[in-house]
Amino acid sequence: MHATLREIKRTPEGIKTAQRAFEEFVTNSDFLLPREVVYTGCGSSHFLSQPLAMATTRLGGRGVALPCSELLYSREYYPVGKPELLVSISRSGETTEAVKALESLDVPKFALTAYESTLSRKADYALIVPTHEESVVMTHSFTAFYFAFLQLLNASFGLETYDAEMTSELTREALKNEGYIREITGEFDFRNVIFLGSGILYPIALEAMLKMKEMALFWSEAYQTFEVRHGFKSVADEGTLVVLLVNEPFDWHEKLTKEFQGQGARVLTIGNGDTGADYFIDLPKVDELLTPILHLPIIQLLSYYKAIKRGLNPDQPRFLSKVVKW
């Protein structure tokens, strides 16, 4: 078994690891997250910073997310405001831009990482979630980091935290779709893929796009669900797979599905309710902030099996390294 597939399958275990890391943090520190937070990261870590910023805003604070390089060199173009905390995210804790980003704002610094590292040592606070992935690409650590920090957000804002055992079991159930995903990639040799998501699922669509590029070296795009109708849909035809990430679909999702099918594309809907798609993966209804956790292992499996279909080794993605440094 490839290390990448093994790491995807560790998602349920990663949720439990995340819960232990959260509990250890709150036991050893009385720190509470403030209301105004800037999140930053690179690549997958940036796409992780986006749902964390959205969750902060949804829970009553104000979250802003931007890539480390933009925070370092172009932040005057972003609504950074007057944050009370900077959260820098890096799986290794050694990513050059993530470490340098800690110095970009004169506010308390927080590291979200998997290791005792340069990042954690330079930060004022560190939430270390020891996922210690073997895979080059970020897989279950994305989900674990998100869950651990979501727990900290809830606790800091005086809200009830999520049931880690239940969440872990839900990801285990999601992973049971592996065989169906393998069937889809075997049956339909799509030549491009478009990922769609709204709200907190939009950055998950972006992460899905990146996973497809990293693992399968494959052309993929991502858009806000209904924004795709405004020009972008022109690239979809009989060789296209459209992956619709939804929580609870409504009539617009069904209309969009038919629109793409009318262009010859096939649609895979992932969520709590079918849209009349060619393929459908049914997920249970959960709190909206938990939906990324259920979608992530599925889109990772889709990218993995597309890579296998193309005869590639997902453990050795071209031109990529586990830690990115200048």
Curated annotation (Swiss-Prot):
Record domain SIS: where: 27-169, 180-317
Pathway(s) the chain acts in: Glycan degradation; chitin degradation
Noted pH dependence of activity: Optimum pH is 8.0-8.5.
Family annotation (InterPro entries): GlcN6P_deaminase, GlmS/AgaS_SIS, GlmS/FrlB_SIS, SIS_dom, SIS_dom_sf
Conditions for induction: Expression is induced by diacetylchitobiose (GlcNAc2) but not by chitobiose or maltose.
Thermal dependence, as annotated: Optimum temperature is 95-100 degrees Celsius.
Database matches in Pfam families: SIS
GO molecular function terms listed in the Swiss-Prot or TrEMBL record: carbohydrate derivative binding; glucosamine-6-phosphate deaminase activity
EC number of the protein: 3.5.99.6
Enzyme class: hydrolase
Keyword Nucleus: no
Record's function text: Catalyzes the reversible isomerization-deamination of glucosamine 6-phosphate (GlcN6P) to form fructose 6-phosphate (Fru6P) and ammonium ion. Involved in chitin degradation.
Subunit record text: Homodimer.
Name of the protein this chain belongs to: Glucosamine-6-phosphate deaminase
Protein species of origin: Thermococcus kodakarensis (strain ATCC BAA-918 / JCM 12380 / KOD1)
